[in-house]
Amino acid sequence: MPTAQRAPAALLVRRGGDKLLFDCAEGTQRQLLRSSVGLLELEEVFVTHFHADHVLGLPGMFKTFALRGRELPLRVYGPRGLVDLLGSLKRVVGKLTYDLQLVEVEPGDVLDRDGYRLATFGVAHGVSALGWSLIEATRPGRFDVAAADTLGVPSGPERGALQRGEHVVLPDGRAVKPEDVLGPPRPGRKLVITGDTAPSVEIVEAAWGADVLVTEATFAEEERDRAEETNHQTATQAAEVAQRANVGLLVLTHLSNRYFGPEIAEEARAIFPETIVPRDFDVVEVPYAERGTPHLVKGGASRRREQEVVSSAPQ
């Protein structure tokens, strides 16, 4: 449930120029408008399940896009039942100015993208529901300038080709392979989003080794019975999942309105210290492993923060 300080479920992932919205609760479009992201650049929405606190923002957003004259297609992915659910809202939304594409997916499906893939997995919530993993492709190793100099690889296109994993032939006829000048391959980043769920082996398997696991902690441990009755999990259970999955950072969301956040974070950190409970408009930066660890940027997506950064820049 929303509170005066916290909006319900919606998470935006930005990777390069891609903006991926996971779930869209009531008020999501207003939150986006208040952020540094905005609405019109959204191209894809990924739904975890169809409970009202995860999808009620979709009809209003569809209508707003149309009123703004959007022409760019919008794709919405979700579990089985997506087409029936959103198709039934045509009378509410009215005529659209763009192509709305509804795509149903099953646990185990994979959507390939440029440089990464989105893999779905089953979660335990008592309804048709799934989680999402964003998994980047392995990257070439670091370019060894000294090795390239020793081999006589000239500066320019040849070095660029080797960095892209391509073989090159030098002017004297010698062939140079990428592995001659590149270090070991470097893993990409991995982000896992569960949506609402009870703890399960499937989540541990899907989240194994992830840089970031975003999962729910609807209840504190004292309410474990309530969590089990409603197919949710406690902060303690979420921390145990993160520990078993060997993730880098645990991000807890979907708190009951009886909690403010710090008490949930404290409970989880007793088991898994690398835990945060972000607020609206907070950002979790996920650098490549060689550049650091995932970390919280408070208010990093707020338009106010963006304006402050611009106004403080040297003129």
Language-model features and meaning:
Residues M1-V37, E71-P73, W132-L134, G141, ...:
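Conserved beta-strand hairpin/beta-sheet module of binuclear metal-dependent hydrolase folds
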Residues L12, E106-L252, Y259-I271, P287-P314:
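Metal-dependent phosphodiesterase/nuclease catalytic metal-binding core
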Residues G16, E41-L42, R68-P73, R244-V251:
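Short, surface-exposed connector motifs at secondary-structure boundaries
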Residues F22-A25, L42-F50, P79, V192-T197, ...:
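Active-site neighborhood of phospho(di)ester-bond hydrolases with catalytic His/Asp-centered motifs
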Residues E26-Y77, Q101-E104:
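Active-site metal-binding motif and surrounding structural segment of the metallo-beta-lactamase
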Residues G57-F65, L89, F260-R269:
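Metal-dependent catalytic neighborhoods of phosphoester/phosphodiester hydrolases
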Residues R70-E106:
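Active-site neighborhood of divalent metal-dependent phosphoester bond hydrolases
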Residues D99-L102, L118, T275:
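Generic structural signal for residues in well-ordered beta-strands
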